[in-house]
């Protein structure tokens, strides 16, 4: 795809905390979720869990080291494929799209203080502080 630095630029310039997974698991060396090849169906869940283990292991590394609680994906297929994988391997980490992360981080002029994110989920007190 070639979108390697642009999503990172957006996240680094709009969100308070950004942590890269280990260098040997990102950019050109990233592990594909495999769902683009038709493995996204539920009947392939066992294969998806095994195939998603390398990415889940990289997420677990940054979760344990930095307390990461969200994986932001630029790929819509990853955004759909990773929730069941992370629920199994790293249940402390959620999945969102870069666009959603940006939308939650933006505060428009005249906007009233939000109590929910773009999904309508309640914001934790510390999350409100992090966004602002």
Put a short name on every predicted segment:
Residues 1-132:
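Iron-sulfur cluster-binding electron-transfer modules in prokaryotic oxidoreductases
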């Amino acid at each position: 795809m070639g979108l390697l630095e642009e999503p990172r630029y957006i996240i680094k310039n709009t969100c308070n905390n950004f942590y890269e997974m280990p260098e040997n698991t990102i950019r050109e060396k990233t592990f594909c979720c495999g769902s683009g090849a038709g493995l996204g169906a539920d009947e392939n869940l066992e294969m998806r869990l095994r195939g998603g283990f390398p990415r889940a292991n990289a997420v677990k590394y940054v979760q344990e080291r930095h307390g990461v609680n969200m994986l932001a994906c630029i790929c819509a297929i990853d955004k759909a494929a990773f929730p069941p994988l992370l629920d199994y391997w790293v249940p402390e980490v959620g999945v969102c799209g870069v666009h959603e992360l940006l939308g939650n981080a933006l505060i428009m002029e005249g906007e009233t203080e939000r109590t929910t994110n773009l999904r309508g989920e309640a914001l934790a007190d510390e999350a409100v502080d992090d966004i602002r």
